[in-house]
Amino acid sequence: MQFSKFGEKFIQDSPILQLMDDLGSALNSDTPINMLGGGNPANIPEVSAAYEAALQQIAASGAAIESVSNYASPQGDAKFIKVLVEFFNRRYGWGLTSDHIVLTNGSQNAFFYLFNLFAGQFCDGSHKSILLPLAPEYVGYADVQVEGSHFVSLPPIIEKTTHEGHEGFFKYKVDFDALENLEELNNNQIGAICCSRPTNPTGNVLTDSEMAHLKQLAKKHGIPLIIDNAYGAPFPNIIHTGASLEWDDETILCFSLSKVGLPGVRTGIIIAHPKIAKAVSNMNAIVNLSPVRFGAAIATPLFENDEIIRLSDELISPFYKKQSAFAIRRLQEEFADYPVYIHQPEGAIFLWVWFEGLPISTTKLYQILKEQGTLIIPSEHFFVGMQTADYPHAKECIRLSIAQDDHTLDQGIKTIGEVVRQLYHN
């Protein structure tokens, strides 16, 4: 049997496939596994109870059965879109209309659309790429483009820092000197700029100043700035440093219901210029007919009365801040006298750990830890759009999920400590 080039692209091994396969294997395993590698959000009992109440409410009202027994338009559930318009205008005064919002079957679906809209071959014969202002970035971006992989990214400025008075931390910053002199940007070979904020995998939050600079660059070159806000404000608000949220017609904001604790409903939200929203809606019609409505049905009452804000601010964000503090303490206990650094824990549901001068790559470390019942994600695949052969830092980091209970975090970090200390000694 032969597949097309399109088919061959999507059946080959890829980092996101590895991540999801390992997640599935861990969830179905009879052997206890310290699952520090996946992107699944935590099960927070009080949050789950709120969703159960919302489910009961829509079941009693008939909204649940109505949502699964009828298609939405390709744009998405009309009632939820109306509620979202009111929600964002109430909080930010952006002057949105329903034409500015389109729903997708999760954020991954949204970025498949957006990255194929703004990168690849254009009608005039030119080829353009997506610019990621710094790597590492979300591994799920890497393989979504139909025609090859069209990404350009730059290594970050690495600044060693302190956190709450403690040494052993660092922060990534955008290298704007390199960015402004980037050949592809200045030769009209970039179709859009994209960043996640907070960043998956590092928890980095680009500062307001950095975001303003990126916006200015995008405007200068006549391209959109895409912001992946899956972990940001106002929901799930897993962000532990000051950061404002801005939008205009030249910005594309992407949200998700996944990290508020509803990954299974596969609901993504795009806020963009109506022309872009319409293009995504058309793609929905061809690829999916229409987005799934069930997530919209659950979420509608939570956005109508701002319950989603209470859940985010009072339960979700504090939970991850607590887990972050616990994991940091354990990592510093395990590596007190080793060249191990943690990225500033500014947000998201991960910690990014740098083993400076590690004798092996973290891809090999991943295999060793996997055999010992602990799953992490190695760093190399997160450097999307970058050549890493001569960049050792790209092979020295791991992503740890903090969406686990204390026992799993403790045992997983203990195993990592034992293995990595031995590697340094050898």
Regions found by a protein language model. Name each.
Residues 78, 82, 86, 90, ...:
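PLP-dependent enzyme catalytic core of the Aspartate aminotransferase-like
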Residues 359-365, 407-411:
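Short, conserved charged micro-motifs
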Residues 127, 146, 247-321, 418:
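Conserved core segment of the aminotransferase class I/II
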